[in-house]
């Protein structure tokens, strides 16, 4: 007896509020993308065990095949389960027929734009990119070359990428309840100038790789909401970096803070949660921005020294972080500038709690 088999699996791990609409949007988007080279894989040998099947499926996904046709002996739908490959990177559908215990199945794959972009770098082939993705990819290559020509240390390259993203783009769109799928993509962030956390993290990820950095994306939650950020390896030790959280809302392209730049597990876990078994442990503090530059104030005297040192160098923007020391109001800072000849002082930061502050004077 022949049975018709039809299964569809859509990845469900897109990072924003109201994810259902974003997933539906992706489903519609991948069916209309133009300008991509399509490929099909046909396995001439029958599959006799699940490990052989998994290897073939992984090969198809890694090569971004559009279809994979197979014959499976002793087929059991519960064993040959495509949910095994659940990922935000790929949507998989399966159609075919089962006669007795032999199944003839064609799997179809649709790939997230971010996956195609990252794989283009990893494989060195841009054949799978559509026209818009190709233009953005080349723009990122140019940016990475610019950064590498200016900086030699991994820390400086990382900071340059962080600062580029924070000062160039903004979080959004903020005028819709559910951000469109495009707002989750590298392409959307670069070409539209705005995006959500996934776009920020994936852009940091691919630029980091292009600059030779050991960087990866990490998924979890921030204050209970699905979120994506990054982990970077510097001098053999790992750090968290959340570029999205360092970009102020509403956007201020002139403001740079580093509250989430190279944090330990303990530091970032104040607001973030994740499956710690799936990612490297982050315990180092050397390359935390404020530690690295000596911009940590634990009392009034240390804050005074930080400000005076910056002013002596002619700096008009001063950043620092308080630890075990609370600034209750802007007056706590303004008093340090009295008699120094400035007509305006612009301060950003959360008074009444420890954290990062930025001061601009003129």
Each predicted region: which residue ranges?
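Alpha-helix capping and helix-loop boundary segments enriched in small/acidic/polar residues
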Residues: 131, 191-195, 217-219
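Hydrophobic/aromatic-rich core segments of domains that either
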Residues: 199-266
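A short, highly charged nucleic-acid-interacting micro-segment common to nuclease
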Residues: 186-200
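Linear, non-domain "peripheral" regions
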Residues: 17-142, 312-314, 328-331, 337, ...
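His-Asp-centered catalytic microenvironments across diverse enzyme cores
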Residues: 237-333
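Sec-dependent N-terminal signal peptides of Gram-positive bacterial secreted proteins and lipoproteins
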Residues: 1-17
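Secondary-structure boundary elements
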Residues: 130-189
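Solvent-exposed loop/turn segments at secondary-structure junctions
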Residues: 167-172, 176, 195-197, 221-225, ...
């Amino acid at each position: 007896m022949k049975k018709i088999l039809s299964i569809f699996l859509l990845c469900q791990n897109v990072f924003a509020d109201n994810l259902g609409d974003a997933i539906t949007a992706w489903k519609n988007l991948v069916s209309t993308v133009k300008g991509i080279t399509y490929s099909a894989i046909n396995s001439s040998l029958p599959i006799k065990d699940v490990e052989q099947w998994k290897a073939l499926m992984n090969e198809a996904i890694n090569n971004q095949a559009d279809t994979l046709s197979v014959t499976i002996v002793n087929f059991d739908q519960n064993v040959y389960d495509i949910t095994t490959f659940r990922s935000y990177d790929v949507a998989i559908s399966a159609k075919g027929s089962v006669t007795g215990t032999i199944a003839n199945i064609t799997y179809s794959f649709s790939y997230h734009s971010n996956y195609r972009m990252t794989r283009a770098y990893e494989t060195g082939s841009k054949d799978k990119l559509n026209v818009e993705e190709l233009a953005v990819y080349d723009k990122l290559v140019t940016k990475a070359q610019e950064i590498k020509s200016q900086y030699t240390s991994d820390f400086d390259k990382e900071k340059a990428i962080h600062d580029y993203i924070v000062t160039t783009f903004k979080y959004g769109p903020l005028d819709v309840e559910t951000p469109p799928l495009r707002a989750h993509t590298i392409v959307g962030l670069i070409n539209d100038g705005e995006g959500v956390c996934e776009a920020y993290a994936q852009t940091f990820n691919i630029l980091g790789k292009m600059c030779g950095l050991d960087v990866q994306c990490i998924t979890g939650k921030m204050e209970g909401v699905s979120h994506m950020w990054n982990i970077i390896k510097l001098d053999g030790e790992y750090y968290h970096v959340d570029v999205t959280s360092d970009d102020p809302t509403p956007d201020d392209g002139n403001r740079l803070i580093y509250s989430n730049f190279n944090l330990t597990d303990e530091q970032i876990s104040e607001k973030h949660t994740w499956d710690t078994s799936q990612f490297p442990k982050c315990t180092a503090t050397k390359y935390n921005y404020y530690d690295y530059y000596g911009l940590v104030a634990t009392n009034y005297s240390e804050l005074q020294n930080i400000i005076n040192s910056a002013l002596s160098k002619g700096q008009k923007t001063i950043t620092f972080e308080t630890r075990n020391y609370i600034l209750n109001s802007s007056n706590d800072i303004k008093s340090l500038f009295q008699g120094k000849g400035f007509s305006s002082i612009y301060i950003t930061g959360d008074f009444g709690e420890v954290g990062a502050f930025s001061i601009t004077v003129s």
